[in-house]
Amino acid sequence: MNEIRETLVQTPKKATAVIRAEALAKTYAEGKMRTPVFDGLDLSVATGETVAIVGASGAGKSTLLHLLGGLDIPTSGEVYVAGERMSALSDAQRGKLRNQALGFVYQFHHLLPEFTALENVMMPVLLSGEDVAVAKSQALQLLESVGLGHRVEHKPSELSGGERQRCAVARALVNKPGCVLGDEPTGNLDDKTAGTVFELMLELNRAQRTSLVLVTHDRGLARRLDRVLELHQGKLRELAPSAV
């Protein structure tokens, strides 16, 4: 992150917050119609913390995740990632910060079909400017840790659904990001495989102190995280364990 910090605008930050949203608002416009998703939303995620975001379909959970990851631009308000104010950055700077400070895991793995598991996991390291030898070493280490050491030369089409998602988790973590954002990362898997992938993410969270922010409809999985936040009518509210 040192190289990034030399070129990006410095902003005040809470020392323990890896991601912070302040007065976040998002409204979609189509012609004269305005559809507000949320307004005045605040959120802070500490280093190593695990947070579940739950809510009804269409509540804006994925939109919130995209805003936190700098994949979408808020109508108003600010998002800080690793202390950097996202709105102050160019597209190139945001992309560089995302690659080094964040990891993403989706319901669909989004692995590149023409590349092997190893090559897919190497990609973020190469994009950060490291040479092939470093990228290969880091990718092999992560693939081994997720139980795919024997499948590194296989392409996504040759992997099972659970193996593809484990490969996606390895890719998300290979640059040792401060936070991983997951949008229903186990949603396409059967219960047993989903549990395995979820356990893997928690193990890597503990080992690397990587924060997790997971959008999920599975209240059982959500209860196992440090905090559960419900997005309801444009507001975030923390749920008591008994209410999850």
Curated annotation (Swiss-Prot):
Keywords annotated in UniProt: ATP-binding, Cell inner membrane, Cell membrane, Membrane, Nucleotide-binding, Translocase, Transport
Root EC class: translocase
GO MF terms, alphabetically ordered: ATP binding; ATP hydrolysis activity; transmembrane transporter activity
Binding site residues for ATP: G55, A56, S57, G58, A59, G60, K61, S62
Principal localisation: membrane
EC number of the protein: 7.6.2.-
Taxonomic superkingdom: Bacteria
GO biological process, one term: lipoprotein localization to outer membrane
A GO CC annotation given for this chain: plasma membrane
Job description of the protein: Part of the ABC transporter complex LolCDE involved in the translocation of mature outer membrane-directed lipoproteins, from the inner membrane to the periplasmic chaperone, LolA. Responsible for the formation of the LolA-lipoprotein complex in an ATP-dependent manner.
Subunit structure and binding partners: The complex is composed of two ATP-binding proteins (LolD) and two transmembrane proteins (LolC and LolE).
Family classification: Belongs to the ABC transporter superfamily. Lipoprotein translocase (TC 3.A.1.125) family.
Name by which UniProt lists this protein: Lipoprotein-releasing system ATP-binding protein LolD
Organism ancestry: Bacteria, Pseudomonadati, Pseudomonadota, Gammaproteobacteria, Lysobacterales
